[in-house]
Structure formats: structure tokens, C-alpha cells
């Protein structure tokens, strides 16, 4: 019930603000915090695009995140994550779910905090 109330408030606030701006709604949090699930619900409610950064990376590379880490290493993954995230954040009026560790990246953090509406889920 609490989640429903919070989602309703997010949607009412966001609909008014996001449709008049170039901002995105960005969901942040550690792995398993609900970024993708809640982001998907919010995007459907607002009838705007949903971008899941981890899914975008998997499509781009053709491997799961786990396989990318195993085969290419974390450094490679973080480089792809940065490029994919910053490119996605250039779009406007979308709901974006970041990867669990993406917000530790200075460029991503600065872009999100300076130019978008963000929600930390825990």
C-alpha cells in the first residue's frame, strides 16, 4: 500500500514537471532495490519511454551483465556502462533505471544530479 501511495505521488509530480522539461526521471539504488520494476511501472503510468541501462548494455554487447564481467572484466563493463548511461541521459522525458554501481561514476552522478529528477531506492 505504501508503494502505491508513493508511486501515485511520483506520477502526479512527475507528469507536471517532466512533460515541460528536458529532464528524465532516474531511479538509483543498489542491485535488487527495485529500480527496474518501479521504473517500468512509473513509465507505463506516465506513458513515456522506459530505459533500463543494464538491458541496453546486454543488447549492445550481446551478453548478460554476468558474462560481460566474467569474459571482459569490470573495467570494460564500467566503460560501456558510462557510455550507455550518458547517451541515454541525453534523451528527454523518459524514465531511466541505472545499473547498481553506475552512480559511483563521477560523470554519471554529476549529470543525474545537475539535470534530472532522481529517486534513490533502498
Regions found by a protein language model. Give the residues of each.
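ATP-binding Walker
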Residues: 33
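P-loop (Walker A) phosphate-binding loop of NTP-binding proteins
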Residues: 30
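Hydrophobic anchor at the beta1->P-loop junction of P-loop NTPases
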Residues: 27
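Walker A/P-loop
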Residues: 36
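ATP-dependent small-molecule kinase phosphotransfer cores
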Residues: 49, 53-113
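Conserved phosphate-donor/acceptor-positioning beta-strand/loop module used by diverse small-molecule
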Residues: 112-122
Amino acid at each position: 500500500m505504501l508503494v502505491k501511495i508513493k508511486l501515485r505521488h511520483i506520477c502526479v509530480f512527475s507528469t507536471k514537471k517532466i512533460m515541460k522539461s528536458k529532464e528524465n526521471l532516474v531511479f538509483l539504488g543498489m542491485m535488487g532495490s527495485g529500480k527496474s520494476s518501479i521504473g517500468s511501472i512509473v513509465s507505463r503510468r506516465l506513458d513515456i519511454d522506459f530505459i533500463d541501462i543494464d538491458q541496453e548494455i546486454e543488447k549492445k554487447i550481446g551478453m548478460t551483465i554476468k558474462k560481460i564481467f566474467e569474459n571482459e572484466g569490470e573495467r570494460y563493463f564500467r566503460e560501456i556502462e558510462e557510455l550507455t548511461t550518458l547517451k541515454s541521459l541525453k534523451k528527454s522525458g523518459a524514465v531511466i533505471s541505472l545499473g547498481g554501481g553506475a552512480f559511483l561514476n563521477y560523470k554519471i552522478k554529476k549529470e543525474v544530479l545537475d539535470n534530472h529528477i532522481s529517486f534513490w531506492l533502498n
